[in-house]
């Protein structure tokens, strides 16, 4: 019996608004059978629904709730709803994303405008409140449009996007560990869901082969490589398995329907009803990439959009026909409803790096629910742009020269050297499903459960486990240097979606080769073209390079320590985190309180 079958976890959330009104929300986590794509399996429901309910708060609301608890126990924790923007909640208990424990959060902007001091270190890592006129005026100078976009952003549409499998997380992990092979989640995920709805499509192997991203097989895989009728690459490729590893391989223990044997199911796709008579025809949409592995691309037929927020942080808006987002990211877009009223397909496929898989939803103008679909497609089933113009007008976050989404208002890190630098070498160790953040150390899913680092920050000192911990000083500037494709057996590294809790980071550098510099400042002097300290992006989730030909890559992320606490830094691909790809960063540990408040004492 699954661990969830015996568990009923009740989480209570309270918040007090400006009128001193207290609101209570109770989240009941249960485990039962469902069929979000038309094929039954057990999954997690929250308050009887999947995905979990959207939580909408106002900025600076005081929130009270419970941390993860054992049955029969309780614990109340308190925090402020901040910063405003598009966020999401989920669990890091093993691979519970695979089982459906995730939901959207929207913290609505409130308060009055405040001065934004660019020369103040703390302000550089914060965002302003209040007036967003400067944001919307980059989209339209019309005063009515500016007011309308402000209203649309206050009350957006929510789209929680996930990849979905017929296997539970425990079943999926067991397939890899029993077989001794890396079984990509793409192999077992036949569906893309939007707001918990989707279908299983089986268009045929030849169709899927033709939908491969141009040049992918030629660049990454041996000649003659073909996808299966589920759009999956062969599991035994060296580029997938890495190695050689000193373990026994048992491919016969992989269930027959994992990679091939597509079984179609008709169900339903999500429908987003929009009203062109509201907000001067503007609608805001919040996308949450609650995927476990998939890097998705999204577009709306005949409707370009303005991307104005990434990871809960405003960016200078840019207009696109499609955009790529990785697991763990959140995007907010503004769309002008200026087309012929009708029903338009939203295309949300896997981007094609791990699987050829289509996903769909519908955007329907109010009153047109019964009309036939209309519009011009910008993306194919497999996520390929339908024309050179669409490709030119699409957002790709691969590297510095294709990622132009700088923060609004302008917000840049301190130039020159940081106060602290930490080199982290990422890759696989010992087995195709074991992943490290620091050369050889594997982060267990129950790391320091008995002696939490929040209460015992020195618990790992002088032990092997200290390789899983970084410590920083409060008020310091920190550079995290990530190196991929250098560990033995992992020179053809897959991409990683690196997410830091507790603070956002600027990606100030990205380049090829092995990091062999004494400092970031030295690297900047030798390779200025690989750095950007004037307009770098500011986010909490970043993608590393997909080393197609075995070439090494590095990235440099800079942040300011002003939020003391123990924070997880990890890959947001569930299989990678489950395999050990995480590290604890004890930010500002010198500023932690000496005495733990009584109510937070461990019992």
From Swiss-Prot:
Disruption phenotype: Reduces virulence to caterpillars because of impaired appressoria and delayed post-infection events. Produces a yellow-conidia phenotype with increased conidial susceptibility to heat shock and UV-B stress. Glycans are attached at residues 246, 269, 434, 474, 516. It is an enzyme of class 1 (oxidoreductase). Cu cation 2 binds at residues 90, 572. Residues 66-108, 159-349, 460-588 form the Plastocyanin-like domain. Its cofactor is Cu cation. Binds 4 Cu cations per monomer. Induction: Expressed during isotropic growth (swelling) but not during polarized growth (germ tubes and hyphae). Expressed exclusively in the later stages of conidiation and in blastospores when M.anisopliae is living as a saprophyte. During infection processes, is also expressed by appressoria on the cuticle surface and hyphal bodies inside the insect haemocoel. Pathway: Pigment biosynthesis. Cu cation 1 binds at residue 499. Keywords: Copper, Glycoprotein, Metal-binding, Oxidoreductase, Repeat, Signal. It comes from the Eukaryota. GO terms for cellular component: cell surface. Cu cation 3 binds at residues 92, 501, 570. Residues 1-20 form the signal peptide. Cu cation 4 binds at residues 496, 499, 571, 576. It is found in: Cell surface. GO terms for molecular function: copper ion binding; oxidoreductase activity. Its EC number is 1.10.3.-. The keyword Ion transport does not apply. Laccase; part of the Pks1 gene cluster that mediates the biosynthesis of an anthraquinone derivative pigment that contributes to conidial pigmentation that provides protection from UV radiation, heat and cold stress. The polyketide synthase Pks1 produces 1-acetyl-2,4,6,8-tetrahydroxy-9,10-anthraquinone though condensation of acetyl-CoA with malonyl-CoA. The dehydratase EthD and the laccase Mlac1 further convert the anthraquinone derivative into the final conidial pigment. This is Laccase 1.
